[in-house]
Regions:
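Phosphate/diphosphate ligand-binding glycine-rich loop within oxidoreductases
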Residues: 53-128
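Glycine-rich NAD(P)-binding loop of Rossmann-like domains
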Residues: 125-159, 186
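Rossmann-like adenosine-cofactor binding region
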Residues: 178-272
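C-terminal helix-to-coil terminal segments
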Residues: 2-4, 24, 102-110, 124, ...
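Short, conserved loop/helix-junction motifs that constitute active-site signature segments
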Residues: 65-71, 86-91, 222-227, 248-253, ...
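N-terminal glycine-/charge-rich "phosphate-binding" loop or analogous flexible N-terminal tail
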Residues: 1-54
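NAD(P)-binding Rossmann-fold cofactor-contacting core
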Residues: 167-183
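Short acidic low-complexity segments
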Residues: 39-51, 63-65, 184-199
């Protein structure tokens, strides 16, 4: 277990580099440090990088060379996903990904909203092709007659699975290790993946992007997907082979999909996803970082470190999450 002996019992010097919102972030952080009477100080000048013990960092910030911070003991990401950070070869420090209650709630609500949108066939009423009063409808299944598969049962996936169970859907989850979630069937391994793909009316992707999960949704895996299933991806764009997904939609193998994450972001204006009538595109907004809540989560981890405890969300670099 990491103990971070350099900063236990000492004032912690923090450098903040969170992209366009760095100034706002530092103001909120300073207020929270004051309100919580924490023994921490924000280092404003990069020329004092050798004094820095901890870094709060976003992928879109201007910092790329972490060798500038030889005494930094930890890097806190402001995002849940860390695959981009881990590509940086100058990082030798432990990385802690963001685990935040409000972000988790946002993701669970977003996923549930899109499941309900399809389940209730709301698009046919919200976006009708003809402006007419049409009360005819196909009798829909009830929630307890619908099977949902959540791929990825980490913090976000587990919360989403619980939210959908509360709505009476039948929920199963697939992950690297078996998870115990009340009312949710936990599946693992290749057989578990085949089972969840073949039995789910809705597939929700909330996996981290690793060598094992890259393009996990491809031509081969789509062959076993239940005919007419709906796919919702709020994990990472790299989980999907785009061309194979489009073919599955064109053939009717998948009936619809909603995508919040993409292999290239922003999604290029000429990308086929924009023009496909079975694809809903949202611009990576399923679970945005909420400044005040995320800062409180990071400061709670800093308090843990100063007590000699391991931070929540410590990344295993070999696993990429």
């Amino acid at each position: 277990m990491l103990t971070y002996t350099k900063i236990i019992g000492f004032e912690l010097n923090i450098y903040v580099s969170t992209g366009p919102n760095t100034s706002e972030y530092k103001k909120i952080l300073a207020n929270e440090i004051y309100d919580q009477s924490l023994d921490c100080k924000i280092i404003e000048d990069i020329s004092r990088s050798r004094e820095v013990n901890a870094i709060i960092y976003s992928d879109d910030s201007e910092i790329s060379d972490f060798a500038l911070f030889p005494d930094s003991t930890v890097i806190f990401s402001t995002f849940a996903g860390v695959e981009k950070i881990l590509l940086n070869k100058t990082i030798s420090q432990p990385v802690v990904r963001l685990i935040d209650v409000e972000m988790t709630q946002c993701m669970a609500e977003w996923c549930a909203a899109h499941v309900l949108r399809y389940h209730l066939d709301l698009d046919s009423y919200i976006k009708p092709t003809k402006k007419e009063w049409n009360t005819s409808h196909k009798e829909r299944l009830l929630a307890d007659q619908v099977d949902i598969g959540v791929l990825g049962l980490g913090t976000l996936g587990s919360a989403t699975a619980r939210k959908l169970r509360k709505l009476d859907f039948n929920v199963a989850g697939w992950s690297a290790n078996e998870k115990k979630i009340s009312g949710v069937k936990s599946l693992v391994g290749p057989e578990g993946l085949t089972k969840i793909l073949s039995s789910s009316d809705y597939l929700i992707l909330l996996l981290p992007l690793t060598e094992r999960t890259k393009t996990i949704i491809n031509a081969e895996s789509l062959k076993v997907v239940k005919d007419g299933a709906v796919l919702i991806n709020a994990g990472r764009g790299g989980l999907i082979e785009d061309s194979d997904l489009l073919r599955a939609l064109d053939s009717g193998k998948l009936s619809e999909c909603t995508l919040d994450v993409f292999n290239e972001e922003p999604l290029p204006p000429e990308h086929p996803f924009w023009f496909h009538d079975k694809v809903t595109v949202t611009p990576h907004i399923s679970a945005p970082t909420r400044l005040k809540s995320s800062i409180k989560s990071i400061l709670a981890n800093i308090s843990r470190i100063k007590q000699g405890l391991q931070p929540i969300g410590l990344v295993e670099k070999k696993r990429s999450y």
